């Protein structure tokens, strides 16, 4: 399974690699990381033959996660990736906006990694 994590915080990469060490070792998961929405779109356009799940932070400088989601839904209409939005703000406005733009799911920080494993359909 290919996962693209989009977050402007550099320590997120290390956190995901630590929390999913078992799955990475068993080659059940492969992570790619993008530090901006623009970088994420470039990655998605260059990996169109792969099934990718995107985990994107909402609050990022430049292109927000919601703007990224809008671009993904417009640019990948025929085979859009699943997009799970992640935010430190658990308000209903972000939740409703993400779902109305086509998000597959929504998680709040700090992340519950067992819940994320369930959403990614991985064993706990």
Regions found by a protein language model. Name each.
Residues 10-32:
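Two-component/phosphorelay signaling modules centered on CheY-like receiver
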Residues 33-42, 65:
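Helix N-cap/capping motif at the beta->alpha junctions
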Residues 42, 66-79:
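Short amphipathic alpha-helix used as the core "switch/output" element in two-component signaling
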Residues 48-55:
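Active-site beta3 strand of CheY-like receiver
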Residues 60:
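Receiver (REC) domain active-site loop signature in two-component systems and cognate sites
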Residues 67, 79-80, 90-105:
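Alpha4 helix (beta4-alpha4-beta5 surface) of REC/receiver domains from two-component response regulators
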Residues 84-86:
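Hydrophobic/aromatic residues positioned on beta-strands within the core alpha/beta folds
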Residues 93, 111-120:
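C-terminal output helix
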